[in-house]
């Protein structure tokens, strides 16, 4: 099978400490991303985790750095600032927020986030209008569709 540019995720390992992203299962949506060094995220604080990887996402996609559900549920750790554009070639770092009352230690090789490839519309036209079409939801915002 020949790989075409619209299906290729190119990964650059920037050091011997870097780990190639992996999928936890064959049908997983994301690729696990690994810490390349130890770091402690302070209680009620934040930190930037090095991965020592760079990547170029397939044509027509961007990379979303998303939280790992286990870190969130078990430890109060959330992921922030997660858009990686196709033309970014620097090291991908992961911003983590610690919402717990205790410091959170991350060891080299720990899975800290996941990379999800999402399709984008490159050539959307912007049209300024006087009003939008009515919808059942209307202007209802947060929590407006129920519990």
Curated annotation (Swiss-Prot):
<dbReference type="GO" id="GO:0004170">
    <property type="term" value="F:dUTP diphosphatase activity"/>
</dbReference>
<dbReference type="InterPro" id="IPR029054">
    <property type="entry name" value="dUTPase-like"/>
</dbReference>
<dbReference type="GO" id="GO:0005737">
    <property type="term" value="C:cytoplasm"/>
</dbReference>
<dbReference type="InterPro" id="IPR036157">
    <property type="entry name" value="dUTPase-like_sf"/>
</dbReference>
<keyword id="KW-0546">Nucleotide metabolism</keyword>
<dbReference type="GO" id="GO:0009213">
    <property type="term" value="P:pyrimidine deoxyribonucleoside triphosphate catabolic process"/>
</dbReference>
<dbReference type="GO" id="GO:0035870">
    <property type="term" value="F:dITP diphosphatase activity"/>
</dbReference>
<dbReference type="GO" id="GO:0035863">
    <property type="term" value="P:dITP catabolic process"/>
</dbReference>
<dbReference type="GO" id="GO:0046081">
    <property type="term" value="P:dUTP catabolic process"/>
</dbReference>
<feature type="binding site">
    <location>
        <position position="82"/>
    </location>
    <ligand>
        <name>dUMP</name>
    </ligand>
</feature>
<dbReference type="GO" id="GO:0006226">
    <property type="term" value="P:dUMP biosynthetic process"/>
</dbReference>
<keyword id="KW-0378">Hydrolase</keyword>
<dbReference type="InterPro" id="IPR033704">
    <property type="entry name" value="dUTPase_trimeric"/>
</dbReference>
<comment type="function">
    <text>Involved in nucleotide metabolism via production of dUMP, the immediate precursor of thymidine nucleotides, and decreases the intracellular concentration of dUTP so that uracil cannot be incorporated into DNA. Shows a significant activity against dITP, another potentially mutagenic nucleotide.</text>
</comment>
<keyword id="KW-0460">Magnesium</keyword>
<protein>
    <recommendedName>
        <fullName>Deoxyuridine 5'-triphosphate nucleotidohydrolase</fullName>
        <ecNumber>3.6.1.23</ecNumber>
    </recommendedName>
</protein>
<comment type="similarity">
    <text>Belongs to the dUTPase family.</text>
</comment>
<feature type="binding site">
    <location>
        <position position="137"/>
    </location>
    <ligand>
        <name>dUMP</name>
    </ligand>
</feature>
<feature type="binding site">
    <location>
        <position position="88"/>
    </location>
    <ligand>
        <name>dUMP</name>
    </ligand>
</feature>
<dbReference type="Pfam" id="PF00692">
    <property type="entry name" value="dUTPase"/>
</dbReference>
<keyword id="KW-0479">Metal-binding</keyword>
<dbReference type="InterPro" id="IPR008181">
    <property type="entry name" value="dUTPase"/>
</dbReference>
<comment type="pathway">
    <text>Pyrimidine metabolism; dUMP biosynthesis; dUMP from dCTP (dUTP route): step 2/2.</text>
</comment>
<dbReference type="GO" id="GO:0000287">
    <property type="term" value="F:magnesium ion binding"/>
</dbReference>
<comment type="subunit">
    <text>Homotrimer.</text>
</comment>
<feature type="binding site">
    <location>
        <position position="142"/>
    </location>
    <ligand>
        <name>dUMP</name>
    </ligand>
</feature>
<feature type="binding site">
    <location>
        <position position="85"/>
    </location>
    <ligand>
        <name>dUMP</name>
    </ligand>
</feature>
<feature type="binding site">
    <location>
        <position position="143"/>
    </location>
    <ligand>
        <name>dUMP</name>
    </ligand>
</feature>
<feature type="binding site">
    <location>
        <position position="69"/>
    </location>
    <ligand>
        <name>dUMP</name>
    </ligand>
</feature>
<feature type="binding site">
    <location>
        <position position="93"/>
    </location>
    <ligand>
        <name>dUMP</name>
    </ligand>
</feature>
<dbReference type="GO" id="GO:0005634">
    <property type="term" value="C:nucleus"/>
</dbReference>
């Amino acid at each position: 099978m020949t790989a075409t540019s619209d299906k290729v995720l190119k990964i650059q390992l920037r050091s011997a400490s870097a780990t190639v992203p992996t999928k936890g299962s064959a049908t997983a949506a994301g690729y696990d991303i690994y810490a390349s060094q130890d770091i402690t995220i302070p209680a009620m604080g934040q930190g930037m985790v090095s991965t020592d990887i760079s990547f170029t996402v397939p044509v027509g996609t961007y990379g979303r750095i998303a939280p790992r559900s286990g870190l969130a549920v078990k430890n109060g750790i959330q992921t922030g600032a997660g858009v990686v554009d196709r033309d970014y070639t620097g090291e991908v770092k992961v911003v983590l927020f610690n919402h717990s009352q205790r410091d959170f230690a991350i060891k080299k090789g720990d899975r800290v986030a996941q990379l999800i490839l999402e399709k984008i519309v490159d050539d959307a036209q912007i049209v300024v209008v006087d009003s939008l079409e009515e919808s059942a939801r209307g202007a209802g915002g947060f929590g407006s569709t129920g519990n």
